[in-house]
Swiss-Prot record:
Keywords: Cap snatching, Eukaryotic host gene expression shutoff by virus, Eukaryotic host transcription shutoff by virus, Host gene expression shutoff by virus, Host mitochondrion, Host nucleus, Host-virus interaction, Inhibition of host innate immune response by virus, Inhibition of host MAVS by virus, Inhibition of host RLR pathway by virus, Inhibition of host RNA polymerase II by virus, mRNA capping, mRNA processing, Viral immunoevasion, Viral transcription, Virion
GO biological process, alphabetically ordered: 7-methylguanosine mRNA capping; cap snatching; DNA-templated transcription; symbiont-mediated suppression of host cytoplasmic pattern recognition receptor signaling pathway via inhibition of MAVS activity; symbiont-mediated suppression of host gene expression; symbiont-mediated suppression of host mRNA transcription via inhibition of RNA polymerase II activity; viral RNA genome replication
Location within or outside the cell: Virion; Host nucleus; Host mitochondrion
Gene3D superfamilies xrefs: Polymerase Basic Protein 2, C-terminal domain (3.30.30.90)
The family this protein is said to belong to: Belongs to the influenza viruses PB2 family.
Organism: Influenza A virus (strain A/New Zealand:South Canterbury/35/2000 H1N1)
Disulfide bond entries: none
Statement: the UniProt record of this protein carries the keyword Lipid metabolism: no
Protein name: Polymerase basic protein 2
Length: 759
């Protein structure tokens, strides 16, 4: 206090002020501080001081030939005095203005190409719409977000190779461009940048922006796609938000969004097939998103979402070490636990076998619309601090945390039996049983939980079983906070294993993800997703299954035909017929299958009854496990367009219509393809199929014994000849080929030769 008084006293004297403002600084320590080292100590002051001088800039002497001595206003642009200590000219800031207005103009053609990301940003902002500003508390949580719209998804190393190849093509150094995207981008950029005068370093920087995903860990309250993040400073403050609709979309956001939809569809579909893991891999490998293979996107794209991570785990890629439960991402921030099995009784006296985690642990829980901090001990919730966008989101988080705590009062709150099943009709595990039960109705759970008086803590408030806020009481251990809980920032990836049923575990055996955790939300993808796998035919409904099944048979008719005659069981078990079964009424599937298989067997036995159209039409029905019955059918029912429609065993119907003249098949009025051979040639089809591997020598030759049936042919040795009965009772002489290589041509020549031999 004394010192301050003394200073005030000094400052009141005019002499003090004069000394401090006018006298030179000549204290050695101060001079040293500001003059030692190359580093500028006060850059802004230095800049202001320099710019106040007449000629603060130096330039090469050649500039005097390019800039006049005075501008239009008669102001001097450069000094005739040389810069001390160098042979450069001293120049006025006015010279820069003159140069910008009157200097030489280079071609600007490359600017939009190089500064593509900036030009696109301007367009997005021009067409974007900003809505009203709302003042309200912003619950922001830090999330890892993409801050660079419009980029490809190359790794830093891949991008580096592309940049070197584009900008410095002649530099030495090992660059191997392997991925398809690398090659495409390199070719495209080399063409764009011919005769480009922009400095290579600048080009390299801009290319990096275009090729690599840049992420930051930022506090966000609203949308997290990159076109929202680029205007984060305009759309949300501490206590306000401004509505904004982006004026354009960017490929990287579309890829992320479409990848999530494709992954969810694939995981949901795989979960109900006989071998989920194999099916999932088959689908990932045969799917394209926006024309790029899904597996390539999975390798490069860092999106963390349950279904995406299951697909990555199946491909052997590393994923985040956090685990998922009830749609929330849990990350253990401290503590540890050991697992043991324990049997518990629900309020309905049903026995559940739980894997109990013993020990004290703390978790952060991050969901789409709510976040929380959870502290728990063995089967006991100690504290839960929740924040969320609305009451519904807060309820969801509380239910998940209460179930996760495994507390006895939660298990005793179960009313009725727990028998929830997944899509494949298998019972869910006990934790998911409990979760589904209380997600449907949490009333009893909240009432049974118990309440406690609370202390007044800043920013926290109590919540009662009926979800009303309170400052006096709250459900035991539960508080609602105004502040969000940050997402776990560590981007570490761990090695995981995945079992047949798509359960993903870390190296300690903890389950991180399972199909139960995959969201049921349906969305429309921004990019075209092309599922080539037959398992995904049903994604567009029953009609698509019907059309795709018949298209597949027609496309593969050559091989289908051979299998039909030689190895029907293998054909019936093909996975391409699996989706079709869901269209056939369950009660009659087996009878249909038995009937069609018997019909087919007769066709094989009684020559001349082979009918291509009929085989194609009825084949999918034969795939179900057959029931032997004496029933005959004149039509078979399929459930499409919301009702049963009939396929006639003999003849056309709206469902299956074959036009003999055009050889086109229409299914439900939609084109399903053309048959390359004429089904009217009666038996030609099966003959040529079975006679692959045999050479037709001519008419019957009695010396080679009685005519064999087509099925007996398989016993011939190579080079052996035999008469064979074909078609409408005609007999021809054949020889089994000595070489297998020419088998392919047989079926074409067979048809012609049979005709010649018979005529």
């Amino acid at each position: 206090m004394e010192r301050i008084k003394e200073l005030r006293n000094l400052m009141s004297q005019s002499r003090t002020r004069e000394i401090l403002t006018k006298t030179t600084v000549d204290h050695m320590a101060i001079i040293k501080k500001y003059t030692s080292g190359r580093q500028e100590k006060n850059p802004s002051l230095r800049m202001k001081w320099m710019m106040a001088m007449k000629y603060p800039i130096t330039a090469d002497k050649r500039i005097t030939e390019m800039i006049p001595e005075r501008n239009e206003q008669g102001q001097t642009l450069w000094s005739k005095v040389n810069d001390a200590g160098s042979d450069r000219v001293m120049i006025s800031p006015l010279a820069v203005t003159w140069w910008n207005r009157n200097g030489p103009v280079a071609s600007t053609i490359h600017y939009p190409k190089i500064y593509k990301t900036y030009f696109e940003k301007v367009e997005r902002l021009k067409h974007g719409t900003f809505g009203p500003v709302h003042f309200r508390n912003q619950v922001k949580i830090r999330r890892r977000v993409d801050i660079n719209p419009g980029h490809a998804d190359l790794s830093a190393k891949e991008a580096q190779d592309v940049i070197m190849e584009v900008v410095f093509p002649n530099e030495v150094g090992a660059r191997i461009l392997t991925s398809e995207s690398q090659l495409t981008i390199t070719k495209e950029k080399k063409e764009e940048l011919q005769n480009c005068k922009i400095s290579p370093l600048m080009v390299a920087y801009m290319l990096e922006r275009e090729l690599v995903r840049k992420t930051r860990f930022l506090p966000v309250a609203g949308g997290t796609s990159s076109v929202y993040i680029e205007v984060l400073h305009l759309t949300q403050g501490t206590c306000w938000e401004q509505m904004y609709t982006p004026g354009g979309e960017v490929k990287n956001d579309d890829v992320d969004q479409s990848l999530i939809i494709a992954a969810r569809n694939i995981v949901r579909r795989a979960a109900v097939s006989a071998d989920p893991l194999a099916s999932l891999l088959e689908m990932c490998h045969s799917t394209q998103i926006g024309g790029t293979r899904m597996v390539d996107i999975l390798r490069q794209n860092p999106t963390e979402e349950q279904a995406v991570d299951i697909c990555k785990a199946a491909m052997g890629l590393r994923i985040s070490s956090s685990f998922s439960f009830g749609g929330f991402t849990f990350k253990r921030t401290s503590g540890s636990s050991v697992k043991r099995e324990e049997e518990v009784l629900t309020g309905n006296l049903q026995t559940l076998k739980l894997t109990v985690h013993e020990g004290y642990e703390e978790f952060t829980m991050v969901g789409k619309r709510a976040t929380a901090i959870l502290r728990k001990a063995t089967r006991r919730l100690i504290q839960l601090i929740v924040s969320g966008r609305d009451e519904q989101s807060i309820v969801e988080a509380i239910v998940v945390a209460m179930v996760f705590s495994q507390e006895d009062c939660m298990i005793k709150a179960v009313r009725g039996d727990l028998n929830f099943v997944n899509r494949a009709n298998q019972r869910l595990n006990p934790m998911h049983q409990l979760l589904r039960h209380f997600q449907k109705d949490a009333k009893v759970l909240f009432l049974n939980w118990g309440i406690e008086p609370i202390d007044n803590v800043m920013g926290m408030i109590g919540i009662l079983p009926g979800m009303t806020p309170s400052t006096e009481m709250s459900m035991r251990g539960v508080r609602v906070s105004k502040m969000g809980v940050d997402e776990y920032s560590n981007a570490e990836r761990v090695v995981v294993s995945i079992d047949r049923f798509l359960r993903v575990r870390d190296q300690r055996g903890n389950v991180l993800l399972s199909p139960e955790e995959v969201s049921e939300t349906q969305g429309t993808e921004k990019l075209t997703i092309t599922y080539s796998s037959s398992m995904m035919w049903e994604i567009n409904g029953p009609e698509s299954v019907l059309i795709n099944t018949y298209q597949w048979i027609i496309r593969n008719w050559e091989t289908v035909k051979i299998q039909w005659s030689q190895n029907p069981t293998m054909l019936y078990n093909k996975m391409e017929f699996e989706p079709f079964q869901s269209l056939v009424p369950k009660a009659i599937r087996g009878q249909y299958s038995g009937f069609v298989r018997t019909l087919f067997q007769q066709m094989r036995d009684v020559l001349g009854t082979f009918d291509t159209t009929q085989i194609i039409k009825l084949l999918p029905f034969a795939a179900a496990p057959p029931k032997q019955s004496r029933m005959q059918f004149s039509s078979l029912t399929v459930n499409v367009r919301g009702s049963g429609m009939r396929i006639l065993v003999r003849g056309n119907s709206p469902v299956f219509n074959y036009n003999k003249t055009t050889k086109r098949l229409t299914v439900l009025g939609k084109d399903a393809g053309t048959l390359t051979e004429d089904p009217d040639e009666g038996t030609a089809g099966v003959e040529s199929a079975v006679l692959r591997g045999f050479l037709i020598l001519g008419k019957e030759d009695r010396r080679y014994g009685p005519a064999l049936s087509i099925n007996e042919l398989s016993n011939l040795a190579k080079g052996e000849k035999a008469n064979v009965l074909i078609g409408q009772g005609d007999v021809v002489l054949v020889m089994k080929r000595k070489r297998d290589s020419s088998i392919l041509t047989d079926s074409q020549t067979a048809t012609k030769r049979i005709r010649m031999a018979i005529n």
